[in-house]
C-alpha cells in the first residue's frame, strides 16, 4: 500500500485518539518573553532527525493565534514530523518587516532546538495560511531575514503557502484597480518600492538555495489562482521546483481547517510533496 494511502486509512480509525506525542506550549523564542513571540511544539514520542514543520497562522497580519491548528499537529506527528506552530506580533503595533523578523527568529529557535525534540535542524519546512502564507513565501525567498539570524536558506527544505494572493503585490494591485484595499495600505504602505520589497516574487533568483514549493489555493478564487501560477512560473524559471494544486470545493477557511483530515485531497498532495523531501 502506498504510504499516503496507508496514512489516510490509518487516520480514519485513530484520529479520535490523542497521538503518542510530546507537546510543549508557549515557548518563548525571544527574550524578554512576549506572548506574541512564543510557539508550541508537537513532537513524536520517539525517533531522531525527523523533519521539522514550522506553521505560520493567518489573520490578515493583525490577528490569529498559534493554537488554531485544527488536525495538523496530529496528522504530521503521526507521519514522523516535528510540528512547530508560532505566534508573531501584529500590524499596526509593529511593522511588517518586524513581523518578518519574528518569523526568522522562530525559525532560528526551531533550528537551534530541533534536536531536543527529535528533529533535524537542517530539514525545516515552512508552511502558512493566508497572511501566514505570504510570510512563509517571503522568508523562503528573501534570504536577508534568515541572514540576520545567522542562518541561510539551506536549512529550509520546502515551503507550502496556502491560499494567498500577494506573491506579487504590484501585480495584485494592478489587477485590483487603482485603489488598494485598506488592509494592503495598513500592512504594506503605499510606496511602490515597499510593495516590491515585500513581494516574494521579487527575491526569486537562481542559486540562492530557495527550497521546493508546493503552492495550494482555492480553485474558485481567481486572485489566488492567478498569483499562485504566476509565482510558480517565476520559481521554475529560476530552477526552483514548484507545484501548484487547486483545491476544489474549498473556501479560504476550509482549505486550512481541513488540512490533516482523512480523505482531504490537499492533504494528500501535501503528504506526497513532503515524502519527496525526505
PLM regions and their residue ranges:
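Alpha/beta-hydrolase superfamily serine-hydrolase fold, recognizing
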Residues: 15-278
Amino acid at each position: 500500500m502506498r504510504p499516503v494511502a496507508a496514512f489516510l486509512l490509518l487516520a480514519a480509525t485513530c484520529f479520535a485518539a490523542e497521538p503518542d506525542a510530546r507537546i510543549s506550549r508557549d515557548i518563548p523564542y525571544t527574550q524578554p518573553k512576549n506572548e506574541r513571540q512564543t510557539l508550541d511544539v508537537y513532537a513524536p514520542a520517539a525517533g531522531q532527525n525527523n523533519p521539522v514543520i514550522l506553521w505560520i497562522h493567518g489573520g490578515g497580519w493583525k490577528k490569529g493565534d498559534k493554537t488554531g491548528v485544527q488536525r495538523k499537529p496530529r496528522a504530521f506527528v503521526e507521519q514522523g514530523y516535528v510540528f512547530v506552530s508560532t505566534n508573531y506580533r501584529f500590524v499596526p503595533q509593529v511593522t511588517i518587516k518586524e513581523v518578518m523578523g519574528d518569523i526568522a527568529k522562530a525559525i532560528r529557535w526551531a533550528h537551534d532546538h530541533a534536536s531536543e525534540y527529535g528533529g533535524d535542524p537542517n530539514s525545516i519546512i515552512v508552511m502558512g495560511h493566508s497572511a501566514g502564507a505570504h510570510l512563509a513565501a517571503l522568508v523562503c525567498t528573501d534570504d536577508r531575514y534568515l541572514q540576520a539570524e545567522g542562518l541561510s536558506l539551506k536549512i529550509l527544505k520546502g515551503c507550502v503557502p496556502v491560499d494567498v494572493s500577494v506573491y506579487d503585490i504590484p501585480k495584485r494591485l494592478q489587477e485590483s484597480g487603482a485603489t488598494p484595499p485598506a488592509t494592503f495600505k495598513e500592512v504594506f504602505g503605499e510606496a511602490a518600492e515597499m510593495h516590491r520589497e515585500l513581494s516574494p516574487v521579487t527575491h526569486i533568483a537562481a542559486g540562492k538555495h530557495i527550497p521546493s514549493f508546493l503552492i495550494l489555493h482555492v480553485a474558485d478564487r481567481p486572485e489566488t489562482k492567478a498569483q499562485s501560477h504566476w509565482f510558480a512560473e517565476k520559481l521554475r524559471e529560476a530552477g526552483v521546483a514548484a507545484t501548484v494544486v487547486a483545491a476544489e470545493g474549498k473556501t479560504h477557511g476550509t482549505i486550512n481547517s481541513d488540512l490533516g483530515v482523512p480523505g482531504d485531497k490537499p492533504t494528500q498532495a501535501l503528504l506526497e510533496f513532503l515524502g519527496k523531501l525526505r
